[in-house]
Curated annotation (Swiss-Prot):
Homohexamer. Forms an RuvA(8)-RuvB(12)-Holliday junction (HJ) complex. HJ DNA is sandwiched between 2 RuvA tetramers; dsDNA enters through RuvA and exits via RuvB. An RuvB hexamer assembles on each DNA strand where it exits the tetramer. Each RuvB hexamer is contacted by two RuvA subunits (via domain III) on 2 adjacent RuvB subunits; this complex drives branch migration. In the full resolvosome a probable DNA-RuvA(4)-RuvB(12)-RuvC(2) complex forms which resolves the HJ. The lineage of its organism: Bacteria, Bacillati, Cyanobacteriota, Cyanophyceae, Oscillatoriophycideae. The gene is ruvB. This is Holliday junction branch migration complex subunit RuvB. It comes from the Bacteria. Residues 8-22 have a biased composition (Polar residues). Residues 196-266 are annotated as: Small ATPAse domain (RuvB-S). Has 3 domains, the large (RuvB-L) and small ATPase (RuvB-S) domains and the C-terminal head (RuvB-H) domain. The head domain binds DNA, while the ATPase domains jointly bind ATP, ADP or are empty depending on the state of the subunit in the translocation cycle. During a single DNA translocation step the structure of each domain remains the same, but their relative positions change. Pfam families: AAA_lid_4, RuvB_C, RuvB_N. It comes from Microcystis aeruginosa (strain NIES-843 / IAM M-2473). Mg(2+) binds at residue 80. Belongs to the RuvB family. It catalyses: ATP + H2O = ADP + phosphate + H(+). InterPro entries: AAA+_ATPase, AAA_lid_4, DNA_helicase_Holl-junc_RuvB, P-loop_NTPase, RuvB-like_N, RuvB_C, WH-like_DNA-bd_sf, WH_DNA-bd_sf. Residues 1-24 are annotated as: Disordered.
């Protein structure tokens, strides 16, 4: 019996190369090798680096822990890397965990008790902390004190344990999902932005040197243009293009070979993959380019609504292919042009669609 592939299914050979979330390969030794070890080595995020240099210098002069920090922005932009750099600059340890791993009070209690003076605790996806764990962090962040409840019912007692001064660094893709009491306890809240092509080119050339991958600057630019403004994706695409060039029997990554390899992987000239194009084409063809809600797009494409919102939408919004209006998501004329669907552009649709409708 022949099995037909649904039009809503990606090609069987396609990897999810453009997800900003780390793969298993990227969480192991290879990622450690390409991670910058100091602020000087860190490429991009100039405003953030300038602020952190002042914070580090002041904390060192006073011999104090850095104030608590909150990093927010799309995944893959370097929040974890920046936490590790801060620890290295301060000469302290960095304990890394994620909010979903802190299910029970003893999970966070054990970590806090074992921190050394001025150590850094990095909590990824901090917006997903449960209420009990979050409330344990309040006195820990404010007074370096851990309040532990011993016993149950009327016999319950609260025991306070002193903690050494430490720095909590939270990372989130949804800063608006943090409760006000938690957000207000961070002394510095910084946004990480998408990277420019020039910055990604420098990152790719640096990674190519570390991995001993021959590449021209033009080849690096071609990969950078398709990397969705995200270093993690840039390094991933570099490795896949390296494989393509090797199998082709070539010795150096040129812009032509980079373009060929990425086209074969369904990554187009703007960094859109199969799913990006499916989302945009569905909104254009099935909903006639009219404003449409997130759940409707998810149902029509067969993709998870959360995945569309957190993985695909940020970049489409960034490059101006998608707008959010009070009535729903709207595809812009720039996206029609990129997809070769200008003929389907509604006649009353201006070439520069405003971000909001009035």
């Amino acid at each position: 019996m022949a099995i037909k592939r649904s039009h809503n299914s990606p090609p069987a050979t396609e990897e999810n190369l453009l997800t900003p979330n780390p793969t298993i390969e990227e969480t192991e030794k290879a990622a450690a090798e390409i991670r910058p070890q100091s602020l000087e080595d860190y490429i991009g995020q100039q405003d953030l680096k300038a602020n952190l240099k002042v914070t580090i210098a002041a904390a060192k002069a006073r011999q104090e822990a850095i104030d608590h920090l909150l990093f927010y922005g799309p995944p893959g932009l370097g929040k974890t890397t920046m936490a590790l750099i801060l620890a290295a600059e301060m000469g302290v340890n960095c304990r890394i965990t994620a909010a979903p791993a802190l299910e029970r009070p003893r999970d966070i209690t054990g970590i806090l008790i074992n921190l050394q003076p001025r150590d850094i605790l990095f909590i990824d996806e901090i917006h997903r902390l449960n209420r009990v764990t979050e409330e344990l962090l309040y006195p820990a962040m404010e007074d370096y004190r851990l309040d532990v409840t011993i016993g149950k019912g009327q016999a319950a007692k609260i025991r306070s344990i002193s903690l050494p001064p430490f720095t909590l660094i939270g990372a989130t893709t949804k800063v608006g999902s943090l409760t006000s009491p938690l957000r207000d306890r961070f002394g510095l809240i910084q946004r990480l932005r998408f990277y420019a092509v020039e910055e990604l080119t420098a990152i790719i050339l640096r990674s190519a040197t570390i991995f001993n991958i021959p590449i021209t600057e033009a080849g690096a630019i071609e990969i950078a243009r398709r990397s969705r403004g995200t270093p993690r994706i840039a390094n991933r695409l570099l490795k896949r293009v390296r494989d393509y060039v090797q199998v082709k029997g070539e010795t150096i990554i040129s812009p032509q070979l980079a373009a060929e390899g990425l086209n074969q992987l369904n990554v187009d000239s703007m960094g859109l993959d199969w799913t990006d194009r499916l989302v945009l084409k569905t909104m254009i063809q099935q909903f006639q380019g009219k404003p449409v809600g997130l759940e409707a797009v998810a149902a029509a494409t067969g993709e998870d609504a959360k995945t569309i919102e957190e993985v695909y939408e940020p970049y489409l919004l960034q490059i101006g292919y998608l707008n959010r209006t009070p009535r729903g998501r709207v595809v812009t004329s720039a996206a029609y042009e990129h997809l070769g669907l200008l003929a389907k552009l509604p006649k009353n649709k201006d070439r520069s669609l405003p971000l909001f409708e009035f």
